[in-house]
Amino acid sequence: MNKEGKHQLVAEVHDKLQRAKAVFLADFRGMNVGQATDLRNELRKADVEYKVIKNTLLELASKGTDKEALNPYFAGPTAVAISYDDPVAAAKVLSRFAKEQTNPFTLKAGVLSGKAISPADIQALADLPSREVLIAKMLGSMQAPATNFVGVLAAVPGSFVRALNAIRIKKEGN
């Protein structure tokens, strides 16, 4: 790749890093083409971009972004997974892939909200429920008091009607 191509690639990756919510680095040594293709497809389904880029170009591209915390991890073969939407989904796919593979595919580090996170932190992130599940749980807990209140309001007239019905039955019996 010529110098102009490298400048263009650095600018493109810089823009992607600025837009990303999370970035994860992995050592892909020992992966064959089929495994890499499978990983790319799984990540694509989770709206995550997966690329292999030279460390020096990644380091240049990360300058001026909150992803500079990854600079110490740019050593050896490095693949980068860029998540623009849901960091948990990306962490789930990468962690599952690392567990399932017999080759030494390992997570190096990641960055979330401008802070570097370790492979253990990535695993903890992967263990979280998905965004949709968390939102559903939050909405359920917010909705519970209102549902209980409506139940109480509905019980008062119902109790009144049952009391009137009992009085009517008692009077009809006399």
Curated annotation (Swiss-Prot):
Keywords: Ribonucleoprotein, Ribosomal protein, RNA-binding, rRNA-binding. GO terms for cellular component: large ribosomal subunit. GO terms for biological process: translation. Gene3D superfamilies: 3.30.70.1730, 6.10.250.290. It comes from the Bacteria. One of its GO terms (molecular function) is structural constituent of ribosome. SUPFAM superfamilies: Ribosomal protein L10-like (SSF160369). NCBIfam families: PRK00099.1-1 (NF000955). Forms part of the ribosomal stalk, playing a central role in the interaction of the ribosome with GTP-bound translation factors. HAMAP family: Ribosomal_uL10. Belongs to the universal ribosomal protein uL10 family. Part of the ribosomal stalk of the 50S ribosomal subunit. The N-terminus interacts with L11 and the large rRNA to form the base of the stalk. The C-terminus forms an elongated spine to which L12 dimers bind in a sequential fashion forming a multimeric L10(L12)X complex. This is Large ribosomal subunit protein uL10. The lineage of its organism: Bacteria, Pseudomonadati, Thermodesulfobacteriota, Desulfuromonadia, Geobacterales. The gene is rplJ.
